[in-house]
Swiss-Prot record:
Name of the protein in question: Large ribosomal subunit protein uL18
Quaternary data: Part of the 50S ribosomal subunit; part of the 5S rRNA/L5/L18/L25 subcomplex. Contacts the 5S and 23S rRNAs.
Protein purpose: This is one of the proteins that bind and probably mediate the attachment of the 5S RNA into the large ribosomal subunit, where it forms part of the central protuberance.
Organism in which the protein naturally occurs: Rickettsia africae (strain ESF-5)
Family, similarity comment: Belongs to the universal ribosomal protein uL18 family.
GO biological process: translation
GO molecular function (one): 5S rRNA binding
Pfam families xref list: Ribosomal_L18p
GO cellular component: a single term: cytosolic large ribosomal subunit
Family matches, as InterPro entries: Ribosomal_uL18_bac-type (IPR004389), Ribosomal_uL18_bac/euk (IPR005484)
Keyword line: Ribonucleoprotein, Ribosomal protein, RNA-binding, rRNA-binding
Keyword field contains RNA-binding: yes
Amino acid sequence: MRSAKLKFEKRRSRIRHKISKTSNRVRLSIFKSGRHIYAQIIDDSKSITIAAASTLDEKIKKLKKSHCNIENAIKVGEEIAKKADSAGIKDVVFDRGGYKYHGVVKALADAAREKIKF
């Protein structure tokens, strides 16, 4: 029986492989830790990060003690969408990074989807 970490890594690599086929668009990547949630817009062809937002940003950090919750994920999604809009990015590929599309990942994606298209 495989460990949970091994299953997660396999799921993450499978998702990244599928996303790498659409190289003409930038990637909205999500990372969750125990306390925080991070979102980055990455251009893989140039290997640069175009925009980033997380619960460590000063605007969002002030809101609550627990940072990795749905309310703050919505704020991170709105912030990354605002930064993408100012950078002129309208179309991205959503990289959920091996996480289930549920809870904070879904909340962040729905909030970002209001200004960016995936």
